Amino acid sequence: MLLIPAIDLKDGKCVRLKQGRMEDDTVFSEDPVAVASHWVERGARRLHLVDLNGAFAGEPVNGDIVKAIAKAHPDLPIQIGGGIRSPEIIQAYLDAGVQWVIIGTKAVNEPAFVKAMCEQFPGHIIVGLDAKDGKVATDGWANVTDVDVIDLAKQFENDGVSAIVYTDISRDGMLQGVNVDATVRLAQSMSIPVIASGGITNLDDVRNLCAVADQGISGAITGRAIYENTLDFADGQALSDELSGA
């Protein structure tokens, strides 16, 4: 199971939000490209980038930084979310060397867009689903819907997405531990990989996820924990490799 560092971009800086609130941010670095290089040096084999301004603006705002990170690490698989709302945006990111784009709110509000993008960019589309108590949330978590997250994820699997990034929003950025049960339920219901996100705090959480990784959990995104040092990234990836026999 891959441990995937999150680099959340806001106003050109690397930050973390608590539960998706733009006003509740902690700035970790003024130089996100250096942050990316740091995680690569610590053994990261994939990066998760989020354009937070883009998510709220509906179009890329920190795209130049994303492209700079991709250019600095041409062999590193990178996934980007935040403001992915048109094929032109997707094409620009893929041209810049990004491997996957993550469609979030637009996937829920306009599911046909996902199917069309999977046909246009096969193998490069991931859907990010945020859920609270099994129900899908959208618009930077401002809106919890009545849509069942498993039902929607299955629909996107049929459309051809490469993976689902699943965030339990009651736990993200709060260092409360991963909602393993909810993540496993989703992974068991589908054949494409699920990437867990939200709530990873320490090595125990890595251990707990590794114990169920064979249910279809291919990776885990970690943010606040590795920036606030409740989890040492290199130790976490080493433990994951050891437990999965990598």
From Swiss-Prot:
One of its GO terms (cellular component) is cytoplasm. One of its GO terms (biological process) is L-histidine biosynthetic process. It comes from the Bacteria. Coiled coil: none annotated. Pathway: Amino-acid biosynthesis; L-histidine biosynthesis; L-histidine from 5-phospho-alpha-D-ribose 1-diphosphate: step 4/9. The keyword Cytoplasm applies. The lineage of its organism: Bacteria, Pseudomonadati, Pseudomonadota, Gammaproteobacteria, Oceanospirillales. It comes from Alcanivorax borkumensis (strain ATCC 700651 / DSM 11573 / NCIMB 13689 / SK2). NCBIfam families: 1-(5-phosphoribosyl)-5-[(5-phosphoribosylamino)methylideneamino]imidazole-4-carboxamide isomerase, PRK13585.1. It is found in: Cytoplasm. Keywords: Amino-acid biosynthesis, Cytoplasm, Histidine biosynthesis, Isomerase. Its EC number is 5.3.1.16. The active site is at D8, D130. Pfam families: His_biosynth. It catalyses: 1-(5-phospho-beta-D-ribosyl)-5-[(5-phospho-beta-D-ribosylamino)methylideneamino]imidazole-4-carboxamide = 5-[(5-phospho-1-deoxy-D-ribulos-1-ylimino)methylamino]-1-(5-phospho-beta-D-ribosyl)imidazole-4-carboxamide. This is 1-(5-phosphoribosyl)-5-[(5-phosphoribosylamino)methylideneamino] imidazole-4-carboxamide isomerase. Belongs to the HisA/HisF family. GO terms for molecular function: 1-(5-phosphoribosyl)-5-[(5-phosphoribosylamino)methylideneamino]imidazole-4-carboxamide isomerase activity. It is an enzyme of class 5 (isomerase). Its main location: cytoplasm. The keyword Cytoplasm applies. The gene is hisA.
